[in-house]
Amino acid sequence: MTRLKAKYSPTKGKRKEDKHTKRMRKSSFTRTQKMLEVFNDNRSHFNKYESLAIDVEDDDTFGNLVLMENDKSDVDIPVIEEVTSSEDEQRAESSKRNNSLEDNQDFIAFSDSSEDETEQIKEDDDERSSFLLTDEHEVSKLTSQQSLNTESACNVEYPWIRNHCHSKQRRIADWLTSEIKDFVHYISPSKNEIKCRNRTIDKLRRAVKELWSDADLHVFGSFATDLYLPGSDIDCVVNSRNRDKEDRNYIYELARHLKNKGLAIRMEVIVKTRVPIIKFIEPQSQLHIDVSFERTNGLEAAKLIREWLRDSPGLRELVLIIKQFLHSRRLNNVHTGGLGGFTVICLVYSFLNMHPRIKSNDIDVLDNLGVLLIDFFELYGKNFGYDDVAISISDGYASYIPKSCWRTLEPSRSKFSLAIQDPGDPNNNISRGSFNMKDIKKAFAGAFELLVNKCWELNSATFKDRVGKSILGNVIKYRGQKRDFNDERDLVQNKAIIENERYHKRRTRIVQEDLFINDTEDLPVEEIYKLDEPAKKKQKAKKDKREGEIKKSAIPSPPPDFGVSRSKLKRKVKKTDQGSLLHQNNLSIDDLMGLSENDQESDQDQKGRDTPSGQDEKSPLETKTVDAQTRRDYWLSKGQAL
């Protein structure tokens, strides 16, 4: 125990540590000393040939090449002498005088003379000059290639300005307007894209008809209005004669049918929402498809939007710009609080419809798209009162209304929200799902600042500094595949628009919820619009019958025969008048009590049998007061008759 304590005492440990350190230093020093002794060893540098004598004649002998054909002494031996240069002789003499190896001057020269170096330098200069002095055609070709590369590098982020340079525009607003038109032409659908979408819709429609013969598939949304971006989805709706396809079982049945037919991949069925929907991708065209059920408001909205496009120039251009702006910032999805397509269209339409300079015909819309785009961002990014103001569009006219006056407005998540009345249903707020309005307003305000600052910057720049610049590129980003500037909508018919117009020609406006006209059958228009007259109600038929009886009783009786005495005639007329008065009184009582005519007739027959034949019937009008017992007996008899 004592040794252990001494071993682990601080002093012992310190002494042991110092001893170990000294040993390491000594060993390292010894190893280093042995390595340095190599340089002090003269034996490794001993010159073994120092004692040998150098013969001067060896140079001449060594320089001669002797060829011996045979050993005969009488044969002359030819000798070929190699002439050495003066520099070689001088080098040999210097080597004889000095031992370069001993003097540590045994370096190897890379060239024999400076003439070779000068010749090499001249050759390099000739090659460099020959490379620089190329043909003028090749120089211009290289310059043009470099300029094309520079232009392509500048147009990577702004492909719509390729071969469309507007930097020489004197007015910056005209530059922005031209750039907006170029962008719209750049993203407009080509002939192949329209054909691809038409084929996809035809395949889906045949599949729905194959599953349900009484149903049909219709297209609404951006594809039915020509307001879709490249690669945007297609909105469809399935309507049937019985209007029962919104049931969950039918939805899953259609989903299985499309998947078995190979028309859908990455399918998602959403049934626990207000509007059930099927989302999938068509594998051949890679287009996103959304299918809803038993809805007609989208088809009505598509027709209304096409009317707006015909009446409002510049609406399509601004809508496509705003859609791309929101798409690049991921603010176009309603499920995440963004703005939907119909909401954007209503915003732009109300903006153009209420712009003071447009209403006064002060400016042309198509020539001032740049200014209008900046005004749009300023209005909805800085000046619009989202807390108190709503937008109303009725009969093609837009207006602002206070939210307090919209009594049927559903309460939103926050007071700061966008409210737009549905043009087809004034009680519906089409923008109630856009709950992320704060970020959308910030995006609009930021776009306004970017456009204004860029316009000021390029307005003060020279034409040389404007080359390759873009104003719209500060707020619009397009990262899709390269496209051509071909707007080929006039070359191919859009079947979605044709089917929508045909649908509205066949369809009548639905008045009752339980009335649905099957517009899928190819019937004449006259038969579709022909409605059966509804059957008359029973009460109305009874009332008409009673009125006819009263009119008959009011008609005077035919003239009597001359053989009848006057007294009998008076008596007969008196009875007729009394019977008509009694009948009128009974009608009023029956109408008040709700008794039928059969009960009345049976009651009268019973009274007729009880009354003696010789007595005259007394009219109820002669009784001025009716006591309680009489009323009790009357109602008791009515109850027994029933």
UniProtKB/Swiss-Prot annotation:
GO BP of this protein: cell division; histone mRNA catabolic process; nuclear polyadenylation-dependent CUT catabolic process; nuclear polyadenylation-dependent mRNA catabolic process; nuclear polyadenylation-dependent rRNA catabolic process; nuclear polyadenylation-dependent snoRNA catabolic process; nuclear polyadenylation-dependent snRNA catabolic process; poly(A)-dependent snoRNA 3'-end processing
Main localisation, per the record?
Answer: nucleus
Write the Enzyme Commission number(s) for this entry. Answer: 2.7.7.19
Which cofactors does this protein require? Mg(2+); Mn(2+)
Q: What GO terms are given for molecular function?
A: ATP binding; metal ion binding; poly(A) RNA polymerase activity
Q: List positions binding ATP.
A: G298, K323, N428, R432
Bias regions of kind Basic and acidic residues — which residues?
88-100, 604-635
Where on this chain does Mg(2+) bind? D233, D235
List Phosphoserine occurrences by residue.
Answer: S596, S602
Signal peptide extent: none
* Residue stretches of biased makeup (Polar residues): 578-588
Location relative to the cell: Nucleus, Nucleolus
Which keywords does this chain's UniProt record carry?
Answer: ATP-binding, Cell cycle, Cell division, Magnesium, Manganese, Metal-binding, Mitosis, Nucleotide-binding, Nucleotidyltransferase, Nucleus, Phosphoprotein, Transferase
Give every PAP-associated domain span.
368-428
Q: Which domain of life is it from?
A: Eukaryota
- For this protein, what reaction is catalysed? RNA(n) + ATP = RNA(n)-3'-adenine ribonucleotide + diphosphate
Q: Which GO terms describe its cellular component?
A: nucleolus; TRAMP complex
Q: Where is this region: Disordered?
A: 1-29, 84-104, 535-642
Oligomeric state and interaction partners are given as: Component of the TRAMP5 complex composed of at least AIR1, MTR4 and TFR5. Interacts with POL2, DPB2 and DPB11.
Which miscellaneous remark does the UniProt record hold? Present with 2240 molecules/cell in log phase SD medium.
Q: Mind telling me which PANTHER family this protein's record contains?
A: INACTIVE NON-CANONICAL POLY(A) RNA POLYMERASE PROTEIN TRF4-2-RELATED (PTHR23092:SF15), POLY(A) RNA POLYMERASE (PTHR23092)
Put simply, this protein is called Poly(A) RNA polymerase protein 1
